A protein has these predicted regions:
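Alpha-helical interface subdomain recognition
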Residues: 3-177
Length: 177
């Protein structure tokens, strides 16, 4: 009895609290990896030419780069909001579940796009992209698979609407309370 941390039956809640901060750290790692993948892609497309034109000057390539930049930006804002709430000691469960799914899928998409922009070089071992691509797949499984987090998030959206008549509290609530 003297070795019990917290109160009896509080172990799961304590574990969830620890996971909240771990997920924040994982999220920051995902953003950094996505940013590096986009940097590698940018370095490649500005020097690579096809049919007499730089890849960087092609509209489709620019759209791909823009989409990656937008995803990284959304991820950063999401993490800043979660970090703010963590600093204030606020409940992070809903935001962490949303972010866990979004960030794992975001880094997967950005690294995949970087590989695509590199062509066969991106899938070789001459860049870190192929190794990252296989490693980041686990992000959608660890700390609970995407489907579990989506199920919980969806349930919270319904619950918020039934309780408050709006889904806002299940979508991050007030950005800075």
């Amino acid at each position: 009895r003297e070795n019990i941390l917290g109160g009896r039956g509080q172990g799961f809640n304590m574990g969830q609290h620890r996971l909240a901060y771990g997920r924040l750290r994982h999220g920051m790692h995902n953003v950094a990896m996505a940013q590096r993948a986009l940097d590698l892609a940018a370095a490649h497309v500005v020097q690579r030419e096809t049919f007499g034109k730089r890849l960087a000057d092609r509209q489709g390539v620019r759209w791909m780069m823009a989409d990656c930049a937008a995803e990284i930006y959304k991820a950063r804002l999401m993490l800043l909001h979660i970090a703010y709430k963590a600093e204030k000691g606020m409940d992070l469960r809903q935001e962490n579940g949303i972010a866990k799914v979004f960030l794992a899928n975001m880094v997967h998409q950005v690294v995949d796009t970087a590989i695509q922009l590199h062509g066969a070089l991106g899938y070789s071992h001459d860049t870190p992209l192929a190794r990252w691509y296989t490693g980041i797949r686990s992000q959608r499984l660890v700390d609970g698979p995407d489907e579990v987090h989506r199920w919980r998030t969806g349930a919270n959206v319904i619950k918020a609407f039934e309780k408050y008549g709006t889904t806002a509290s299940a979508c991050g609530g007030e950005l800075f309370e």
